[in-house]
């Protein structure tokens, strides 16, 4: 009798799971039109009507005070007002912010709400009392730590932190009005007119943009003396979000995921190398001939780095030396929403700051391309962050239908994904290291608990099934890696890929046309330009700028060989 009762309970549970997934897939089909609504790019930065710009930018700044509240450190959490505005549907309309409720991404059980989608940049409205309360807590932190400066940081297209340091007594004023920075610092193209990016708006390249801080990211920097930092989103001086901003693009994709009833739990796993600093460095003899200094016995450096990252809100799950001398691996604790990319962004600067104290050079840019993997481990959860949608109740090495469709999307777009995730010539050497044959491309591989695959499915561990996207190198911008992965996975969910996914109890994934990863960056750029899904998801403006930047780098690869050696200082 007990066996029969257990079987009945299992059947009932299985029926409930099937009904839940069927309901969710039905919701995906209903919302497909909504979340795939194309941009109207006839009106972009630099072209909008600038009448009443002061009123618009003041309204924009007020909308941006709270930002991402995934890690509140100053001020209490609060419910925010949701304001509905029209989408940007015509050249004569100006994009208006539509605030969303804050996200809580610190634990899997928290609610997850991202901040923007394709047709709006959504941020939370902070009422004057809330702003006063949050600023009060930040001022207490500043006084307690005797802070003198606050760095307003934003990510450029390479994922390098670009910042301006503000004296502490001007912080509150800059929170309200923002910090101005030349647009060219973030877009990194000598001149868009020279690269045929945007003839009409070429003068916009030399304009200023505005860095607006997300106060929830305010942290005291352990590796900088009496200095704090705050991560910023970027806007034009008329209050429009900068469409080439990697963080804005990532938040937009996460919001589309939320619209479909899902949230993303993710973490980055990075390899980087530590070198000794040569005694003499100049533009002609620069080298890293000093013996590698970091190995299993050099713990103080890594311990200080991990402790510093913890105090900036980035929790490290583990670290170790890796396969080669001087190569280190660091794994972050999974978090919901944009937090995982923020953590990776913090690491990229923090590791260099700590390395300097030890007279080391830390680099994610390795010319050989073999020591710089950047893995995005991720899983799909329900919107409340309570159920892993990749997991079957059986616990065996097997994905759900939703998981298989997500994986199918990653495989389908792997060629274009590789362009964003291995964005330098040296990065792509990793793809061909297992073969000696001269090929134009290699197959995109996937498997269960197989670390040699491009997409490695791991079903062990307390968080359940997850997919490791191993296409990425540590050189890639973490915000773009996150955004592109979500965009490709969403396309898999929204496409009619039932035949591709196969039955629920199967571990196979049938592909009518096996996907390939181009070995040459030039071919990957073509794949990105021809991928309509990613073009629409990431935005036409961003794709044009990114492709132009990479083509410029390829054209100047030989003459810039000397300059590329200095990239080890910055990337």
Curated annotation (Swiss-Prot):
A cellular-component GO term for this protein: cytoplasm
Coiled coil location: none
Molecular function per GO: glutamine synthetase activity
Record region (Disordered): 1-129
SMART domains xrefs: Gln-synt_C (SM01230)
Composition skew (Polar residues), residue ranges: 103-129
Biased composition (Basic residues): 26-36
Gene3D superfamilies on file: Glutamine synthetase, N-terminal domain, Glutamine synthetase/guanido kinase, catalytic domain
InterPro entries reported for this sequence: Gln_synt_N, Gln_synt_N_sf, Gln_synth/guanido_kin_cat_dom, Gln_synth_cat_dom
Domain GS catalytic: 246-571
GO biological process: glutamine biosynthetic process
Bias type Basic and acidic residues, positions: 11-24
PANTHER family referenced in this protein's UniProt entry, alphabetically: GLUTAMINE SYNTHETASE, LENGSIN
Official protein name in the record: Lengsin
The species this protein was found in: Oryctolagus cuniculus
Gene that this polypeptide is encoded by: LGSN
